[in-house]
């Protein structure tokens, strides 16, 4: 019985709905609150906390069709996609789950009922496996379901350790685990392969279609198994695999949804070979890429974004291999949305964004793709008998041409050649070391000073503190005291000075002692100690002395305003551009702030104005800015935004600005958003692929900036004899007039060139009966030379012309040959003859060529050589 992929998905969910299960929508491909996972890769991911007892749902039976990605991380099918019948980066996992409700008997009967009654698969084509010691499951299959014993296979510990088996599932080294039973479909003896557990089990005859996991134990640290108080069930069946069976095909790529994508891809790139493996790759990759972007992942050079970038670039490379000459990949997203319209509401809603992101990423990559492939072809041609591409070549392709290592591996795999992965990793480590060294400006106190001391920070509540000097260092040497003029770093018992971290620069101020002042120019961290950099401005200072630490309050306030506005800006960017925006870095100073964020294209002027408006609205709302210490998980549950890649303590500081922004942050902030006063973006630019940078000012600095802009506008208005309200029209008038004058100048030059050409005709000589003109001119530019050449050739009808002009250390040359003589004399050869003698080079067509040089003094002799050269050829 044929069923479409969509019909199978619907039938599965409706079957389990009828069995009392709650139909739960697919969760995002980006796992929430699970840092152990790169992507959602199984149906149970969204229920993990339920299985662990940390979450409780209103239902105890659930069913889903979960979108999954397996690329990068522990589960990575990327390198096999396109080369096998069943590997994918993206697939749908059909599943039914019991949270302490039914167990083995019902789970087995549900699975068998769906396969044999709803899908009507022949029972004789089905074979099952159970864990070797799971007699309960074996008996249910044989005695209650009626599967013959010879079609039930016991699988023991086949992975080298107790409970390490294809038929024993575990969430980790400890925790919930249990045996599983798997259902296989027998394609028939005309397909090579053996039963599960046999030496030929890797063949394609018996294909696993459903895995039913019985979570009944809690594995302890010592390896012992304790029964779970509420055994549960987790099942998974690949939609693509069961669709292949129901549609009577052997490869997943032959099912309806893949065939539609393959045909569309073939149409776009212009190929008729529908069996080409590259079409399989493209059809698979558009599914993972489109849904990842729809779920908020953007191409980048780290984490999930880098996996997405690798998949996109692999697809683009296969498109070029098929002959694509223009960007094509993004055009498949609409076809995918149409094919999966029943379950792709998120993709359909985000389709314009998805297409734009994929198009921009492809456009960026194709600029270097062809050059990288040429380099790789050159390396392959000179590889000889070697079967491995050197690591330094793989690194160069990555670093210079944007080739992920697995893309290079994919290219050379087609030649049965591998890559030196260890060599590549070594080159990457060298690059990281170089980057670290290059970024270490000034003194690295973390390296210099190994201080076993944690400085309490009191600066959230006060800007002055009576405290004691516990350490004075000049370089790496601890000293007992300082005199006027000494530069040093000082460690205090406790301090109100904020040390540079989280993008916020360190405080400055003074340390006052009875007979001296130490000027603090910067505050940084050395381990957990806070150190105060500066110099002894007056008097002396000794270790152990009591000092009054005074932070520069005006500077701290300016920094606080700029830090607070980064939070508002982050929220505004997510509102204006999309939830994919995340902070990539920041620099919060007293004069201005800088904010780096993930986004795939430059912001338009209208979008910049929109972001400014959103931020200034929140400033005018004058929200109270509150801080609270919370448990990390509680903070995340409360909606606090954590920065990707940042390490946080168990207790974190949560900064709230009304209902608009909630972030984890250890920096200093204003008391209310209104204190910021005014926010103005002064620059927006790209700093890396997929990363944008905004520079902005606040408060008085923003007002000063607007005054400067106003002054410049007034000055410009005066220059064009207008005012600030009509300056654009006035500038337009000036530009229009300038263009008109340029046209008149060009016309005048053309007339002068024609006149000069007529004057030059008097210098024409004959060589072997052919007209020849070789002349040096004063003050003519290259464009004028071209006009003169055309006029002279028209006047001469037949002949050879070489003109030269020089000035300011440069030489311009042009040669022309009428068509009847290009068989004897080539303009390109002639102009190069002269160019080589005047320190230059050039080229062009047989009838016209241009060149440049750097030795004006050599022009006369070079022109003299032309006559003898022509005599040999005419």
UniProtKB/Swiss-Prot annotation:
Enzyme Commission code: 6.1.1.7
Any single Gene Ontology cellular-component annotation: cytosol
The record's free-text note on cofactor binding: Binds 1 zinc ion per subunit.
Cofactor(s) needed by this chain: Zn(2+)
Chief localisation class: cytoplasm
Source superkingdom: Bacteria
Enzyme class: ligase
Catalytic activity reported: tRNA(Ala) + L-alanine + ATP = L-alanyl-tRNA(Ala) + AMP + diphosphate
One example GO MF annotation: ATP binding
Keyword Aminoacyl-tRNA synthetase: yes
One BP annotation, GO: negative regulation of DNA-templated transcription
Subcellular localization: Cytoplasm
Entries under SMART domains matching the protein: tRNA_SAD
Positions that bind Zn(2+): 563, 567, 665, 669
Gene3D superfamilies named in the record: 2.40.30.130, 3.10.310.40, 3.30.54.20, 6.10.250.550, Bira Bifunctional Protein, Domain 2 (3.30.930.10), Threonyl-trna Synthetase, Chain A, domain 2 (3.30.980.10)
The entry's keywords: Aminoacyl-tRNA synthetase, ATP-binding, Cytoplasm, Ligase, Metal-binding, Nucleotide-binding, Protein biosynthesis, RNA-binding, tRNA-binding, Zinc
CDD domains: AlaRS_core
Role: Catalyzes the attachment of alanine to tRNA(Ala) in a two-step reaction: alanine is first activated by ATP to form Ala-AMP and then transferred to the acceptor end of tRNA(Ala). Also edits incorrectly charged Ser-tRNA(Ala) and Gly-tRNA(Ala) via its editing domain.
Annotated domain remarks: Consists of three domains; the N-terminal catalytic domain, the editing domain and the C-terminal C-Ala domain. The editing domain removes incorrectly charged amino acids, while the C-Ala domain, along with tRNA(Ala), serves as a bridge to cooperatively bring together the editing and aminoacylation centers thus stimulating deacylation of misacylated tRNAs.
Similarity comment text for this entry: Belongs to the class-II aminoacyl-tRNA synthetase family.
Protein's name in the database: Alanine--tRNA ligase
Source organism of the structure: Aeromonas hydrophila subsp. hydrophila (strain ATCC 7966 / DSM 30187 / BCRC 13018 / CCUG 14551 / JCM 1027 / KCTC 2358 / NCIMB 9240 / NCTC 8049)
